[in-house]
């Protein structure tokens, strides 16, 4: 009677092949998720630039906009445009965006906010610790609103998106 079974060497070869395939798969998966995070950060940035542009156009037409300006409150308020640009863009607009939909930092999903008030230097500071945040800044002394995002570490100049949206 002849037994049919795999030899120890054959089994070790199969285990080695599975290990190699798993290692290649993990590297490919990490590259895929890294690219997805960069793209999500870029999308958040682009959406914020579009929203700021839309708000400025609405202000130019009507002098006021409807926003859910209070954090965690879905009540829509009619807000006069630019009584204080910092409060208007960095408080009311950020609150409206969060109340309208969920914004996550792709690098810290579910842990903290993706939208932050502040200067573009904030996007580049912290040695990459601010990666994924969208920074919004409008000041009374400025004729524009700035939107900045670090899309990937180390948050060097080539990793920062910056848009200035001018207030007409």
What are these regions (language model features)?
Residues 2-33:
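N-terminal single-pass transmembrane signal-anchor helix
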Residues 30-33, 37, 105:
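Poly-acidic low-complexity segments
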Residues 34-73:
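Conserved hydrophobic/amphipathic alpha-helical signal-anchor segments
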Residues 57-168:
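Periplasmic/extracellular, small/polar-rich flexible segments of pilin-like filament-forming proteins
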């Amino acid at each position: 009677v002849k037994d049919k079974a795999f030899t120890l060497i054959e089994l070790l070869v199969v285990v080695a092949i599975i290990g190699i395939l798993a290692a290649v798969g993990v590297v490919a998966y990490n590259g895929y998720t890294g690219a997805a995070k960069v793209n999500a950060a870029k999308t958040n940035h682009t959406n914020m630039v579009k929203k700021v542009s839309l708000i400025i156009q609405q202000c130019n037409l009507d002098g006021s906009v409807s926003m859910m300006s209070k954090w965690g409150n879905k009540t829509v308020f009619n807000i006069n445009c630019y009584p204080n640009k910092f409060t208007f863009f960095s408080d009311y607009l950020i609150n409206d965006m969060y109340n309208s939909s969920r914004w996550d930092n792709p690098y810290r999903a579910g842990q903290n906010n993706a939208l932050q008030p502040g200067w573009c230097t904030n996007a580049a500071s912290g040695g990459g610790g601010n990666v994924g945040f969208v920074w919004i800044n409008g000041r009374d002394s400025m004729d524009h609103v700035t939107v900045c995002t670090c899309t990937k570490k180390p948050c060097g100049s080539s990793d920062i998106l910056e848009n200035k949206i001018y207030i007409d």
